[in-house]
Amino acid sequence: MSDREEHEPTHRLSRRTVLRLGLLAASAAPMLAGRAHAQDKPGAHLIGKLEGPELVTDPAKLPKSFKEAPELAELVKAGKLPPVEQRIGQDPLVIKPLRDIGKYGGTWRRGFTGPFDTSNGHRAAQNDKLLYFDHTGTKIVPNIARGWEVSPDGRVTTIFLRRGMRWSDGQPFTADDFVFWFEEVYQNKELVPTPLPVMTINGKPIAVRKVDAATVQFVAPDPYFALPTVLASVWGIGHHARYGRDALGGFAPAHYLKQFHPKWSSKDEVTRKAAEMKFDSWVALFKNRNDACRNPDLPVVTPWKTISPINTPTWILERNPYSVWVDSAGHQLPYIDRIRMTLAENLELLNLRAIAGEYDSQARHIDISKLPVLLENQKKGGYRVYLDPSTQGADVGLFCNQSFDRDPEIAKWLGTREFRIALSHGIHRQQVNETFVLGLGQTGSAAPGERTLYFPGPEYKTLHCAYDVKKANAMLDQLGLTKKDSEGYRLRTDGGGRLRLALTTYLGFLPFTQVAEMIVQQWKQIGIRGEVQEMERGLATARLRANEHQIYFETQWGADNMFGHSPFFFPIDGGTPVGPLYGVWYASAGAQGKQPPPRMREVMEKYRKAFGVPDAERTRLAKEVWKIALDEMWVIPVVSNSPASQGVRVIKTNMGNIPERLWNSAVSDNPHIAHTETWYFKS
């Protein structure tokens, strides 16, 4: 459900490249640590002020008349479209652009890597979340929903839709589209065999019901105060364009999808239709027809809609004529006519095109190791480079599998807190930071950014993360790992020879394999033998879910808001690398998987409880979760809060309303956190 599903390879930095960027790294790294005085140093302009456009909610400031793109005005004139006032409805979403009222026109050029790179479009162009976060990531605001209300007991969340809002084909967008999704899609076991965790509270299902055409309610059996956060995030509901392909999303265009559903014809009829269209089942057909990236005919409520699908060499999205977004001067948004994404067969080609100035705005798949060359070519390429440090905590982390059980000796050590802390003290983080992230990361704990909602406190920023070989060796000795072989490596206590730790890596946004190889060399000083096992992403995931990995290299996706994304630093499902069997136990309420030890159960209980309590109590519990997790060090951090993952932003200088810095997180869906429908071409 997030970008962790769709990664591309990065590349090793040469020594020459590192040296060329020495000055930049030296100046930029302190800024990431929050030192304001670094702004007068060379390279400081690369990390600017966190900023974004504002929603206009004051009735006195709402526009009284409306305008539209010239091409849409021509269609209205020809009688092929209703007037703009009828298309945007009675409650348009009004945005005050960051800097300017923009101009219509132009094609935004981007790169993508193939049919699995769906998040590329979701993040840039397909925002249809009911609720959203503001540009700081700390405040929930309306989006395609006009507003929301949580009952005093937390059991009913009421969503107020925008009256008169329409799907991209002109049909009304109403509460019926929510009821259709809930009753005929979500509750159909062929389409959705397993309940979505966030559609339950304390293991009990929640329901969706219609109040009137513009009002829908999510009704829970127990208090569910966190539901607005869930709807604003990337959990699988409240966001049709991203999750329709999985029959999730929270709403769907009933008037279009009924033709592919057996209830409105017959099982035989939709099965026949599926066979004609070369799908192996009606379920596969239904999900394909509900895929906003693959089906140009699908009605959507996004700013742009697909007209040439993602499974072609050029993925094209065009302005939605029924877009509900409007600027503060009354211009229907988006300003930009269309988005054209060109297939890049590999990451190297995509980055070369960025360097050559062939993209108008691109951060996804931009390799941080290319930063020196990007900077050298800014003027020639007609672009500017911005850096957006993440707030997710560990960009590179060693996720220690707490439920590993294939080797009792290894399982014992992975499950021993002092052993994990000793491994941490044996990592020279600054060496990794300078070599692979150009010195732009933080070398402390896996804690999220200081300005995030659930930052546990300054005392946790560096907990157990000092590079201290002497301390690491002493801790390992105290654990009884005192015997060594002729090469100085520690021996297993069961007589099985050298103690070896398997480090699983895959090709991703960051050079996990190269980082792992460096750590293997560093661990020689503490007598620990690490063995890197690089594999294809799909195989790595399969081994993870089978509980076969020991230590898994990964990014701590979305950890800056554990209620907006699977937290990843403790297990809540079978895809969490710190303990998949424990995650299955949590997700199944103990019916499956393996019961975790007390400390992890304590974290799980606090997390489960937090969904059902008001904001202040939820914040307190979340900070407690972080404190325990950081002290236990189930994730051994290496480099944190850097711009390495989707944080090197290449923007053409003729694009307007571009923020100096974006909130960069799996929860934020950057760049759309900056409301890309307000971006425009100055010339």
Which stretches of residues belong to each language-model region?
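Detector for C-terminal structural segments
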Residues: L24-A25, L93, F112, L298, ...
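A structural "hinge/loop" feature
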Residues: R99, Y104-A124, I144, L227-W235, ...
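Surface-exposed binding/hinge segments that line
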Residues: P197-W282
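Extracellular/periplasmic solute-recognition and catalytic clefts
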Residues: D40, W181, V185-P195, V208-R209, ...
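Aromatic- and charge-enriched surface segment that lines or borders ligand/interaction sites
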Residues: R146-V192, Q217, L350-R353, K412-G415, ...
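Ligand-site clamp/hinge motif
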Residues: R162, W167, D291-N295, Y322-V373, ...
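N-terminal secretory signal peptides
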Residues: M1-T17, L21-M31
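N-terminal lobe/hinge region of extracytoplasmic solute-binding protein
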Residues: E68, A73-P152, E183, K287, ...
